[in-house]
Amino acid sequence: MTISEARSRRAGRPGGRRLRRGLAALAGAAAVALALVHAPPARALPPQDVPAVGVDTGRFKLPIGCTITLAGLPVFYLPTDVDVQGVAPVQLGPGQEFWLTQGSGSITFPSWLTSLAPILGITEADARVTDLTIGASDSTPAAINIAEGEPFEIKDIAIEAGKPLKVGLPLTGTFDVGPYKAPDGGKVTLAFDHAVAEIDLKSQAGFSLPIKADCKPSAGNALLTIGVGGAPGQAPAKLTGAPLNFPEPASNELVGIVNAPYTCTVGGEPLDVGIAVGAHIPLVVRKGGSFSFTEASGALVIPADTVNRLIDEGYGSASGTVTALNLEIDGGTPATQNVIPSGGVPIPRTPLVRDRQITVPLPSGGTLTAGPFTPASGAQSVSVRLGSAAANLAFGGGSGTVPAACGAPSPKVYLVDNPVT
C-alpha cells in the first residue's frame, strides 16, 4: 500500500493512521538537524560533508617504500606515505561498470632528504610520474595505470632544505580511474598498487641529477571495499560532485564517510532512507591485536520528496529515539556491535520544512564508540560493515511511539576490510 492509499483509508483502518504517524515521525524527527546544518556541534558529522545516498568518500594515508635509483643502480630505500582521496559507489551490481572518481594524491619526502640538497646546490626539481596504478580485485581489468601514455609532469618544484617535500597529483582538478567491470558477486577491493616517478634534481649551477623512485605498499594497500549483488544491467557508476573535506589522516589510517541506502519498515510500509557513518579507521590490524574507530559519528538522511509527502499528509513535527545501529564483523569479534549507547540517541521534537532534504547528525554532538574489533584465530582479514538499525518514533508531541526497523543493506556495505598482518 502506498502512503496516499494509507491516507485514503485511514478513517476506516486504524493501521493507516498508525502508518502515517510512523512515516511522519521517521522523516520529521530527522528535521532536528535543520538548526544544526549551518553550525553543527563540535565533533558531530557535518551535514554539508555527508555525500549522497549510495556514495563512499574517503581519504587514505598508506605506508609505502620507494627504491631510489641513480643511473639504474639502487642508491637507497625510502619509507614514506602516499596520501590518496576519492569517491566510489557503496554497492555494485553484477558486471556493472564503475570508476574511482574525484581522485587526487601526494607523496611526501622527509625533511632529512631535502637537508642533503645544499651539499649539491640543489634548489628545484622536475618530476614525471609514469606509473600510478590502482587495482580492483576480481574486476576487469584487475588494475589500471592512470599515467600510462600520459605521464603527470610537474615542473620547477621548489626544494627547501630541511623541510618535507610534498609532490601532489594532479596539479589542477582531479583524476578518474576506470572503467572497471565488477564481478558477478562477492566484493571488490580498490587498492594502491604501484607508483613510479622520474625526478630531475636541478642545481643553481645548471646541472641536473636524474633519479627514479619506484614505490610499492609496505603494509596494507586497500583503499575501500564494495559489495556486489542485486540485479544485473545497472547503469555505469561514475560519481561526481561529492564533498571531500577531510583532514589529513595519520599514517595507515583512513578518514571517510559512507552513506548507505536502507529500506526501513514503519507501520508495515517500506521507506527508503540513507544512513551515513563517518570515522577515522586504521587500515591494518596485527595478529593478536585489535582496532577501533575514532571520532565516529553517524547521520540519517531523508530526501526532500519524502518530507514533502509527509507535509502533504498534514504533519509538521516529530520526535523519537534511535535505539540501534549495528555493525557486522566478518573474520573477527564481536560478531555484531550496536554503536548506539544504552538509552538510545534522542531526537527532539522538530518541524518539517518543505523542499528540504534533512540530514540529522547522530548524535547531534559528540561521537559514538565503535570497537575494539579483534581478528578471529586464523583470519586473514577483518571487515566491518553496516548492519540493521532501529528507532522508536513519535509524532506531533504525542506520548505513543511507533517502531521503525531497518534491515541491513543488500548488497553489503563495507566500512573497512583490513588485512591481518
Question: Which residues does each predicted region cover?
Answer:
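Secretory targeting and sorting signals
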Residues: 1-44
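Primarily mature extracellular domains of secreted and cell-surface proteins
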Residues: 45-421
